[in-house]
Each structure stands twice: as structure tokens, then as C-alpha cells.
A protein has these predicted regions:
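Extracellular and secretory-pathway beta-repeat/beta-biased strand scaffolds
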Residues: 1-278
Length: 278
């Protein structure tokens, strides 16, 4: 693991935790969901061109990659713009898991793969405070200066490109979740889709949007290649204030669609969904 208050991996950096039989575990700025007692960074940056790879080469499951900063600290940020891999073995083995999380999160141009050639796909998890899935960078959350010199806008919303989500869905499942119980209270834990997400390759995949408050779909979500299961999960604290606002088309190419809420989880059509009203 690599951690500290400020962690920066430059564009020529390579972190590898690979073997013929399994992928390893690479932690940058913290552990999965901030657990296991690993120190949590405040500023974590993985620049474009950097490679973080915890794949299995031949047999076995892909490993774990985490790029993290403290999601409970309103001044924390994660910039993840490199290439992140946790693929299953080429002969057999399931895909691994990748997490990129921070109170503010910027992932423009990120490349991820948790695919498996002969097993189950893995998952890419994004866990910021508020997030907009858009078509371009607005720069509202933070600038790209060195970590110690950045300026912050406490009410800013994290950003991920719809094109990056579209590409990632060809190589694994994607989960975006938000939390509104921590931080400075200037965000509600919303997820807003403001640019179209279109899966055009790969096998059956799942896109889960799980918001502490609202999930708002203002642009289409579609698949033209295999099934795309959609889980649109609002009000994950079950306080009754969140909902799913569907203002555009969903086209799943035969996949399932679940809309609802709940603070706990349930199983429906082999998907993990909320245990509230749906």
C-alpha cells in the first residue's frame, strides 16, 4: 500500500501485483471503502499514463485496486486518470474489483478493466459525495494544481465522463454510489446522469446507481451489445427524501431494470437491489 496525507502517482508510474495464479492487492491512499485501519489520504492523484495492475495472468481471479481519499473529509479529493486493471486469468478465473473514491472525485479519461475471458466479470466502484455523469469537465470540484495548492468549492459536485462509464461497461460491472451522511452537509448525495451512457461491446453487464438521495436520469442509458441490467437505487438511508427521476429513455437490449429505494439490500433477478419500495 502507498498512503500518506498526499499521494501522487506520476504519469510514468507502474504498480504491478500480478502472478500466473492470482491478482494481488494494490492500495493507493486507503483500503476498500476506507476499512482495515489503513491510513486514509486527503489528496490522492493517479495521473494519466500511470498503470495500476492487479490482474491474474493465466489462472485465478483478478485482485483488488483501490484509489482512495477520505470520503468523510470535505477537503479530500481523488483524481484517478490512469489505467486500472484487475482482470481474471486468461485461462480461467473471475474479474477482480477496482474502487476510485473520495469526497470529490475526478476520473476524466480513466481506463478500467475487470473482465474475465472464462469467468465472471468484476466490478468498478465509484463512491463520492455528489456526482454528475456528464460529457465534459466543468472543473467545479477542484483544479488540477499540485495537491497542496488546490482551491476547493465545498458545494462542488464530483464528475465522471459518460464515455468512461460506457467504455468500462464493456469490461466489467459498474457501481456508482453516493453518501450524504458525512462531510459538510453541502451536498445531498445525488447522482445525476446528464450525458448519454451507451454500452456497445462486451457481454452482459450491470450498471448500479445507488444514491443517498436522488437518482436523476436526464440523458439516455442504452446497450447495443448484450444485456445491460440497470439498478436505479435512491434514498439509500430510507428517510423518505430521495427518489428516482426518470427524464430520458432506458434501452437495455433485454436487460432488467429495477427502480426503488431502501437502506438494506435484497436480491431480485440475481441482482442486488434495495429492500424498500420499488
Amino acid at each position: 500500500s502507498i498512503t500518506g496525507k498526499e499521494v501522487v502517482l506520476g504519469g510514468s508510474s507502474k504498480l504491478l501485483a500480478k502472478s500466473d495464479r492470482s491478482g494481488g492487492k494494490i492500495l493507493v491512499g486507503g483500503d476498500w471503502q476506507g476499512k482495515e485501519g489503513t491510513r486514509q489520504a486527503v489528496f490522492t492523484t493517479v495521473e494519466k499514463g500511470a498503470l495500476v495492475d492487479a490482474s491474474a495472468d493465466k489462472v485465478g481471479d483478478g485482485g483488488t485496486v483501490v484509489v482512495w481519499s477520505d470520503i468523510k473529509n470535505p477537503k479530500s479529493k481523488t483524481i484517478a486518470q490512469g489505467k486500472f486493471l484487475a482482470k481474471g486469468g486468461s485461462t480461467r478465473g473471475d474479474g477482480g474489483k477496482i474502487e476510485t473514491s473520495g469526497y470529490y472525485l475526478l476520473t476524466h479519461g480513466i481506463k478500467t478493466s475487470v473482465k474475465s475471458m472464462n469467468g465472471k466479470s468484476g466490478e468498478w466502484l465509484l463512491d463520492p459525495y455528489n456526482i454528475t455523469i456528464g460529457s465534459s469537465a466543468s472543473g467545479t470540484a477542484f483544479n488540477d494544481n499540485d495537491p497542496g495548492n488546490d482551491t476547493y468549492t465545498s458545494s462542488a459536485t464530483s464528475e465522471v465522463l459518460a464515455s468512461d462509464i460506457s467504455s468500462a461497461l464493456e469490461n466489467g460491472h459498474v457501481t456508482i454510489q453516493t453518501g450524504g451522511s458525512a462531510g459538510d452537509g453541502n451536498g445531498d448525495g445525488d447522482i445525476i446522469v446528464s450525458a448519454s451512457i451507451s454500452k456497445s461491446g462486451g457481454g452482459d453487464k450491470t450498471l448500479t446507481l445507488k444514491a443517498h438521495n436522488d437518482v436523476t436520469i436526464n440523458s439516455s442509458i442504452s446497450s447495443s451489445s448484450s444485456d445491460l441490467d440497470l439498478v436505479l437505487w435512491s434514498d439509500s438511508d430510507a428517510n423518505g427524501s430521495g427518489g428516482v427521476n426518470l427524464n430520458s429513455n432506458l434501452s437495455t437490449n433485454g436487460g432488467n431494470v429495477w427502480l426503488g429505494g431502501g437502506s438494506g439490500s435484497a436480491s431480485w433477478q440475481s441482482l442486488t437491489v434495495g429492500n424498500g419500495n420499488s
